[in-house]
Regions:
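A residue-level marker of the well-folded mature domains of exported/periplasmic proteins
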Residues: 22-341
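Sec-dependent N-terminal signal peptides of Gram-positive bacterial secreted proteins and lipoproteins
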Residues: 3-22
Length: 341
């Protein structure tokens, strides 16, 4: 009897350690068309994976246009999903509006944006940490260069954390580094980025920070063409791993681990600890990183990204994650002077 009682106690303890299966719980994910967009596939894969842990039903609502975003939020609320998770900046407006009118039993969360609502759990990122790491990588990979390029989408406060982080990272290795900026004024048109990359190479840049979303393809294409002329330039991708075997000039990518973020949100939801308001995720959370440094990549250019360079970069990433290196960004761009050439 004692043996049976002991086994029963162990069985009860084991059951207590297993997450409760959420029978009847439903999660809706609202996002752009997923396709092969790794920024979104990470989220979908995490939602699928955790469904096996928590036992919830889920639905992915893909939105190719503005009308579909509104319709998807309307449908998710009408169908009484328990957690409505929006991915991307487009979700902020709709999540905030629906949270203001929906029943309190429906929870709202967004990834990579701030809904600015006390009815929504907003998850954004300290992108300056990743940008600093990319800047340090540029310095370690090209220690004899002093001119560095940056191509972004739009000028303004939204991109300051990227520009500041990158510049400070470069200067931590190359103190007399200078920088030149160009902006595509688009999230998706590669043509301006292509032209700017060639212009920046002509100005003396070997390394160009690719901060222009899908426009970065223009930088990557320019790098391939310039290489045929013996004028090598190197760059990085954004958000997801953009390294590839057919383009050795893409050295790394500044990562936003959206799958990790989705996991944090869903775990908190089922633990009853999901809090509304803004949550800013960092390198220490595993939500910010870089290909070949904090995460494996598709393709490695070992001639530039040597073991020594990678080790130096990993030391920087570890210092940021541990809090040994604290990045104190100025309150505004007016409080910082870029060494522009």
């Amino acid at each position: 009897m004692k043996k049976i009682a002991s086994l029963l106690i162990v069985f009860v303890l084991v059951l207590a350690m297993v997450p409760a299966m959420a029978e009847g719980e439903k999660i809706a994910v609202i996002c752009d068309p997923v396709g092969v967009n790794a920024f979104l596939t990470q989220v979908v894969e995490k939602v699928e994976d955790l469904a096996g842990t928590y036992g919830y039903e889920y639905r992915i609502l893909e939105c190719p246009d503005t009308d579909k975003w509104q319709a998807s939020y309307d449908a998710a609320v009408a169908e009484e999903y328990d957690l409505i998770l929006g991915v991307g900046w487009q979700s902020a407006e709709y999540a905030a509006a629906k949270a203001a009118e929906a029943d309190d039993s429906i929870r709202f969360a967004v990834i990579d944006t701030d809904a600015g609502s006390d009815g929504v759990a907003s998850y954004s990122y300290n992108e300056e940490q990743g940008a600093y790491l990319m800047g340090a990588m540029a310095g370690y990979a090209f220690p004899n260069e002093t001119k560095f390029g940056y191509i972004g989408c739009f000028e303004g406060s939204g991109s300051f954390k990227y520009r500041w982080g990158f510049m400070e990272g470069v200067k931590s290795v190359v103190p007399d580094a200078q920088i030149t900026f160009n902006y595509t004024n688009s999230y998706s048109d590669p043509a301006p980025a292509y032209d700017f990359a060639k212009q920046q190479q002509a100005k003396g840049c070997t390394y160009i920070f690719g901060g222009a979303a899908a426009c970065n393809e223009g930088i990557f294409n320019a790098a391939l063409e310039l290489a045929e002329e013996g004028k090598n330039i190197y760059s990085i991708g954004q958000d997801t791993d953009m390294t590839r075997e057919d383009n050795p000039y893409v050295l790394s990518s500044q990562l936003k681990e959206t799958g990790v973020t989705a996991g944090i949100i869903i775990d908190a939801f089922f633990a009853g600890t999901l809090e509304n308001g803004l949550h800013v995720l960092e390198m220490k959370d595993g939500a910010i990183g870089a290909t070949h440094i904090t995460a494996e990549g598709n393709s490695l250019n070992s001639e530039i990204m040597t073991d020594e360079v990678i080790a130096q970069c990993k030391a920087v990433a570890d210092a940021i994650a541990s809090g040994e290196l604290v990045l104190e960004m100025p309150a505004s761009e007016d409080d910082y002077t870029f060494p522009i050439f």
